[in-house]
């Protein structure tokens, strides 16, 4: 088959129009290649993705890299297929970009197989109907806002409250306890953080269980709007071909929408509410519907969500919320108390905190813990004004238990061992339930609250109490 060439007819920022001979238009989502000497000296080094057909012989495309240095009349080669990325075990421990090229200077990936980045979501028949909890080994998550296998979790938090450390601990726990793989999509975030994550994962020994796909802030919007799809294709391979339970991290899902809105106007679409693209819900749905459990395996995704100007009604976060099964909210107030992970136990929610999914016992204890913490929160104003002495005996007991619960919700992480000096703990769900049940029931009212800080199970807290008393 002869190669199909077109010519660049106009360049507007990240959007490029290419003219082809009549009857030779490449289909939507096809990848075209152009030589851009401003990137490097390789031939056909710039990938364009067909987005629209304009009339009979012209297509409008989105560039996946810089368009500086392109000129009209340049040749564009139709590759005959969509953007595809290498998949399989060879991608583990590597950093790829949106078009599947390695950017870690460790040579080619040499994967046996490639997947296109636009794929159909699993059909109804293939989807798993079982709702089950996904144990993370992190007490506060497993007890109060459990993750569903194949579910989508929103991770909310400002700068410096521990989002990245929590993500790394989850990668570590799924690798060591479940033997599973993780895929990390860095979408429009800081390159420095992407670099730090790679270094830290290397140090903590989890890098060989994860594939990293980056399209960071400095990339053109085309790359940022597609990099989450590239990562998702890698995760889908592990789910569909290897039957794995994969963790997919997207940091940050807001940037995916933001990139879409940047190219939307250039593509000639009329903007919708707050200037976002009119196709916002469709684009989000196409991405999110591919993240699910099938009869073969599952993809559970944790998505960091930036909320612009703290406005939860902004169309971008509001569209993402519709897809979430659980939320993990990190709070600065809790981080200031030195309690890590700084998850807010009253603000975090989960769809599967339901006795029919997690069982009566777990549900009852989770609700009791929330009740005690909420009561303590309500009493804090009184304590601040009048002091502890003015409380009734019953309220004093609630406060004492709440403070123990608060401290027992902290735990040392494996990936932070180098900083904390205490070995990380993976806590089994039954131990988590047992520990909180005993605190709520008042079995440990005589033990000082500092014994509960930064331990794994309740037995460790009792050991620590003995050491403190000695």
UniProtKB/Swiss-Prot annotation:
ATP binds at residues 157-164. SMART domains: AAA. Keywords: ATP synthesis, ATP-binding, Cell inner membrane, Cell membrane, CF(1), Hydrogen ion transport, Ion transport, Membrane, Nucleotide-binding, Translocase, Transport. It is a peripheral membrane protein. It is found in: Cell inner membrane. It comes from the Bacteria. The keyword Cell inner membrane applies. Pfam families: ATP-synt_ab (PF00006), ATP-synt_ab_N (PF02874), ATP-synt_VA_C (PF22919). F-type ATPases have 2 components, CF(1) - the catalytic core - and CF(0) - the membrane proton channel. CF(1) has five subunits: alpha(3), beta(3), gamma(1), delta(1), epsilon(1). CF(0) has three main subunits: a(1), b(2) and c(9-12). The alpha and beta chains form an alternating ring which encloses part of the gamma chain. CF(1) is attached to CF(0) by a central stalk formed by the gamma and epsilon chains, while a peripheral stalk is formed by the delta and b chains. Belongs to the ATPase alpha/beta chains family. HAMAP family: ATP_synth_beta_bact. This is ATP synthase subunit beta. The lineage of its organism: Bacteria, Pseudomonadati, Thermodesulfobacteriota, Desulfuromonadia, Geobacterales.
């Amino acid at each position: 088959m002869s190669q199909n060439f077109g010519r660049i007819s106009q360049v507007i920022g990240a959007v490029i129009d290419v003219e082809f001979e009549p009857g030779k238009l490449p289909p939507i989502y096809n990848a075209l290649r152009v030589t851009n000497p401003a990137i490097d000296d390789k031939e056909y080094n710039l990938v364009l993705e067909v987005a629209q057909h304009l009339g009979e012989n012209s297509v409008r495309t989105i560039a996946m890299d810089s368009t500086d240095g392109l000129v009209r009349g340049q040749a564009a080669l139709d590759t005959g297929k969509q953007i595809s990325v290498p998949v399989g075990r060879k991608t583990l421990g590597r950093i790829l970009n949106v078009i599947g090229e390695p950017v870690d200077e460790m040579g080619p990936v040499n994967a046996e197989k490639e997947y296109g980045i636009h794929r159909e979501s699993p059909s109804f028949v293939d989807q798993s109907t079982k709702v089950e909890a996904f144990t993370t080994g992190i007490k506060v998550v497993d007890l109060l806002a459990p993750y569903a296998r194949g579910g989508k979790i929103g991770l909310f938090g400002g700068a410096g409250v521990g989002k990245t450390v929590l993500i790394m601990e989850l990668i570590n726990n799924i690798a060591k306890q479940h033997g599973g793989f993780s895929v990390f999509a860095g979408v429009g975030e800081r390159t420095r953080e992407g670099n730090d994550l790679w270094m830290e994962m290397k140090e903590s020994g989890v890098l060989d269980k994860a594939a990293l796909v980056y399209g960071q802030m400095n990339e053109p919007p085309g790359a940022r709007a597609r990099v989450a799809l590239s990562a998702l294709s890698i995760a889908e391979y592990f789910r569909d071909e290897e039957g794995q339970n994969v963790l997919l991290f997207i940091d940050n899902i807001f940037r995916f929408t933001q990139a879409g809105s940047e190219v939307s106007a250039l593509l000639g679409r009329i903007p919708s509410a707050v200037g976002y693209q009119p196709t916002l819900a469709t684009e989000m749905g196409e991405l999110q519907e591919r993240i699910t459990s099938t009869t073969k395996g599952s993809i559970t995704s944790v998505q960091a969500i930036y909320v612009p100007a703290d406005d939860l009604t902004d169309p971008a976060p509001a569209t993402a919320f519709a897809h979430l099964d659980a939320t993990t909210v990190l709070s600065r107030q809790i981080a200031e108390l030195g309690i890590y992970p700084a998850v807010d136990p009253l603000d975090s929610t989960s769809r599967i905190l339901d006795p029919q999914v997690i069982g009566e016992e777990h549900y009852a204890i989770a609700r009791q813990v929330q009740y005690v913490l909420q009561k303590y929160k309500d009493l804090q104003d009184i304590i601040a004004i009048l002091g502890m002495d003015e409380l009734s005996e019953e309220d004093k007991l609630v406060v004492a238990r709440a403070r123990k619960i608060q401290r027992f919700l902290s735990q040392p992480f494996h990936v932070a061992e180098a900083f904390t000096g205490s070995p990380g703990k993976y806590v089994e769900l039954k131990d988590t339930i047992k520990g909180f049940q005993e605190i709520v029931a008042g079995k440990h009212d005589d033990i000082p609250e500092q014994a509960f800080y930064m331990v794994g199970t309740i037995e460790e807290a009792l050991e620590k109490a003995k050491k403190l008393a000695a």
